[in-house]
Amino acid sequence: MDLDKIGAETRQILQDVLDKASLDEGDVFVLGLSSSEVMGGHIGRNSSLEVGQVIVKTVLDILEEKGIFLAVQGCEHLNRALVVERSLAKKKDLEIVNVLPTLHAGGSGQLAAFQYMKDPVEVEFIVAQAGLDIGDTAIGMHVKHVQIPIRPKLKSVGAAHVTALASRPKLIGGSRAAYREDKIRKD
């Protein structure tokens, strides 16, 4: 597998998603990834630490530059818990749980997050403003309502299908109400 190509595809997709998601400094972005799917395998069966490292490092570098927090979702064996910076967990009053990810419980993305984040911890739940799902890992449970699908121009990283979500405030009040412009659906 060409790791440079995986990094370039990740960078292109992330930039596309960020351009459409209208995130602000301090927002949270969730990343779900299956390195097995990126390499053409079945989710959870063929994890690659190197693939996870390239993807997480690429995403983390871009988000940190913009002041956006990264939350890396783990696999079902950790109940899709997330690796975040301790500072975010404290700021958002998230309950920190005691588990260390492994390649087959948490996955390559979480191992990479523990490697590249300054002070990583695991939390069970978060409410992110947007996210990227590489390999159909089901990130929706961690993105706030109302979720808006984002269709990146590039549809895959390696062999893995890619989807993305942003969010917007709920529209309440019915036909008599007036609303602010929706930055996500401005087209």
From Swiss-Prot:
SUPFAM superfamilies: TTHA0583/YokD-like (SSF110710)
Source taxon at top rank: Bacteria
InterPro entries: Antibiotic_NAT-like, DUF436
Gene3D superfamilies: Hypothetical protein TT1679 (3.40.50.10360)
Family matches, as Pfam families: DUF436
Family, as annotated: Belongs to the UPF0340 family.
Record's protein name: UPF0340 protein SGO_0411
Native source organism of the sequence: Streptococcus gordonii (strain Challis / ATCC 35105 / BCRC 15272 / CH1 / DL1 / V288)
